[in-house]
């Protein structure tokens, strides 16, 4: 926990709707990293938040963007899920934004010259589509909790400046 302006722990009594947004929110790949065995049970961030909040708090979800591609579906328009993420934020009391990398983007067995094929990273920034999603969530005016899932260093300066918890 790098930052908490008092928003955490979540107060289930005061929250009516939570938005869970981001490509790693419901991703099992993001949980395991690139060196892993087989767990007997996985619990994604989205599943864990839903379990914690129970039936009294409404949970809205959106993938928001792909991990690094400019669209989530091959034939879709660019930023095809960004509008959906904005609507989730607009209709939520708080947004939990789950960004980062997974085993497909970081590791040692990939193409070392290709940062999008588990190769060496050329920057500490998240992929541009995730930076765009972060900016859209900051512009929503809603409290945002950033949950970073990555096995390497990531520049979080934007998140520290614009979000309520990191």
Q: Locations of the language-model features?
A:
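C-terminal non-catalytic regions of proteins with extracellular/luminal or membrane-system context
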Residues: 1-166
């Amino acid at each position: 926990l790098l930052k908490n302006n008092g928003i955490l722990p979540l107060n289930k009594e005061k929250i009516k709707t939570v938005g869970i947004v981001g490509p790693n929110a419901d991703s099992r790949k993001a949980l395991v990293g690139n060196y892993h065995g087989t767990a007997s049970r996985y619990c994604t961030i989205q599943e864990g938040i839903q379990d914690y909040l129970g039936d009294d708090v409404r949970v809205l979800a959106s993938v928001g963007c792909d991990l690094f591609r400019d669209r989530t579906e091959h034939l879709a328009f660019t930023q095809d899920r960004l509008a959906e993420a904005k609507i989730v934020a607009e209709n939520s009391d708080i947004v939990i934004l789950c960004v980062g990398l997974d085993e497909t983007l970081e590791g040692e067995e990939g193409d070392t010259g290709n940062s999008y094929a588990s190769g060496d990273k050329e920057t500490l920034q998240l992929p541009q589509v995730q930076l765009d999603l972060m900016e859209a969530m900051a512009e929503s005016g809603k409290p945002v909790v950033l949950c970073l899932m990555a096995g390497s260093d990531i520049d979080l300066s934007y998140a520290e400046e614009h979000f309520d918890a990191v």
